[in-house]
From Swiss-Prot:
Keywords: 4Fe-4S, Iron, Iron-sulfur, Lyase, Metal-binding, S-adenosyl-L-methionine, Thiamine biosynthesis, Zinc
InterPro entries noted in UniProt: ThiC, ThiC/Bza_core_dom, ThiC/BzaA/B
Subunit structure: Homodimer.
Originating organism: Nitratiruptor sp. (strain SB155-2)
UniProt-listed Enzyme Commission number(s): 4.1.99.17
Segment forming the signal sequence: none
Binding locations of Zn(2+): H278, H342
Swiss-Prot/TrEMBL GO biological process terms: thiamine biosynthetic process; thiamine diphosphate biosynthetic process
Cofactors demanded by this protein: [4Fe-4S] cluster
Entry binding sites for [4Fe-4S] cluster: C422, C425, C430
Family under the similarity heading: Belongs to the ThiC family.
Protein name stated in the entry: Phosphomethylpyrimidine synthase
Length: 444
């Protein structure tokens, strides 16, 4: 849908959404986002220019539908997919893309680490109408035959540009983890739980040199500026357990991410900040406020956070609790967690479960923040329930298939779609029906 929009800007020296916004130009992408969000296009432009909102939209992903991540927009969710060395199948990842889009993921990250990574990514982008994000260090390591000591800045930049050419709309870059933070890591209960962060630690300790993503950050920005790839500044030192939440390692890295944010903005590159992780409920609001302060109000993109460490098999629920709170306090995007978190590679059904849990969290946050129209669908659902309009209830549910499936387990016949009861209460104990009968008999 963006082919004509991108083509007419082909001769512009800079083609990032932030650049145009700062020039006072409302792009077609901004117009599209404004309609979807129900906001004024000029507000979208101002938020993008200020850095409080990003529109991740690589100039080479032409069939992508524009979307916005920022405090003024609806709370978004990201779904992770990707192969591993033990399970690498492009068709399987495409199936996950379809599930992600069916159930409402706003962005998708391809975290593949096994198989033909370029081919998998190409298929993922081809089938995606939402922005695709990646973590380039995974392919960099893959292309170095899994020998982190063979990583060079030239190899790093080559992979980053290759992925940008393919149409990746945002990169997680682990540039804020500096060599001097290693003593802080040693004090932790669980050390480093970020894959990218642990790889950077291994490289830095092998060479006793500074993080190459940090030293080559200007070169990375040049690539992002060329293709309008947004940066998702990775939290290599996010807490992986409640005991490590809000510690010095996490917060010192966050300060560096704030410095890198300003560098990116100097080159008109859009930025969001990645956040924890595992955080007790009583620390979530503080984490949001600290990010806003340290990182100049750049959009905050959080993984959960999980509010307990003992929910294995149900981490999508433990994290959705924290995600709803984070969204309420000001996080702009929530990275989903599936039931397989900490246990294994998620399949398509796990992806569905994670997305729906996070759609609930994001929607709850939008209602709590008073976003315009957020509660309209809830009010419509209430009307449908009170009227016993079963088909309308299924239609309005975040997961219509699951709602219908559960109803039909006990009352599958079509006649029960007109019934004024469900199998929970039956025809004699339905509170709605009893209330309606009272009002009909005695008046309101």
């Amino acid at each position: 849908m963006r082919k004509e929009w991108v083509e007419k800007r082909k001769k512009d020296s800079v083609r990032t959404q932030m650049y145009y916004a700062r020039q006072g130009i409302v792009t077609e992408e901004m117009e599209y986002v404004a309609k979807v969000e129900g906001l004024d296009p000029e507000l979208i432009r101002k938020e993008v220019a200020r850095g409080r909102m990003i529109i991740p939209a690589n100039i080479n992903h032409l069939h992508q539908k524009p979307m916005a991540i920022g405090i003024a927009a609806k709370c978004k969710i990201n779904a992770n997919i990707g192969s591993s060395a033990l399970a690498s199948d492009a068709a399987g990842e495409v199936e996950k893309v379809k599930v992600c889009q069916k159930y409402g993921a706003d962005t998708i990250m391809d975290l593949s680490t096994g198989g033909d990574l370029d081919a998998i990514r190409e298929e993922v982008i081809k089938h995606a109408e939402v922005p695709i994000g990646t973590v380039p260090i995974y392919q960099i390591l893959h292309d170095c035959n899994n020998k982190i000591e063979d990583l060079t800045i030239d190899k790093m930049l080559e992979v980053i540009e290759r992925q940008a050419q393919q149409g990746v709309s945002y990169f997680t870059i682990h540039a804020g983890f500096l060599l001097r933070f290693m003593p802080l890591v040693a004090k932790r209960k669980m050390g480093i739980v970020s894959r990218g962060g642990s790889l950077m630690a291994a490289w830095m300790m092998h060479y006793h040199k500074e993080n190459p993503f940090y030293t080559a950050f200007d070169d990375i920005l040049d690539i992002c500026r060329k293709y309008d790839v947004s940066l998702s500044l990775g939290d290599s030192l996010r807490p992986g357990c409640l005991a490590d939440a809000s510690d010095d390692a996490q917060l010192e890295e966050l300060k560096v991410l704030g410095e890198l944010t300003l560098k990116a903005w100097d080159k008109d590159v859009q930025v969001m900040i990645e956040g924890p992780g595992h955080v007790p409920m009583n620390q979530i609001e503080r984490n949001i406020k600290i990010e806003r302060d340290y990182c100049h109000e750049a959009p905050f993109y959080v993984l959960g956070p999980l509010v307990t460490d003992i929910a294995a098999g149900y981490d999508h629920l433990a994290s959705a609790i924290g995600a709803a709170m984070a969204g309420w306090y000001g996080a702009s995007m929530l990275c989903y967690v599936t039931p397989k978190e900490h246990l294994g590679l998620p399949n398509a059904e796990d992806v569905r479960e994670g997305i729906v849990a996070y759609k609930i969290a994001a929607h709850a946050a939008d209602i709590a923040r008073g976003r315009k129209g957020a509660r309209d669908v809830d009010d419509a659902m209430s009307d449908a329930r009170y009227k016993f309009d079963w088909n309308k209830q299924f239609e309005l549910a975040l997961d219509p298939d699951r709602a219908r499936e559960y109803h039909d387990e006990t009352l599958p016949q079509d006649v029960f779609k007109e019934a004024e009861f469900c199998s929970m209460c039956g025809p004699k104990f339905c509170s709605y029906k009893i209330t309606q009968d009272i009002l009909e008999k005695h008046g309101a």
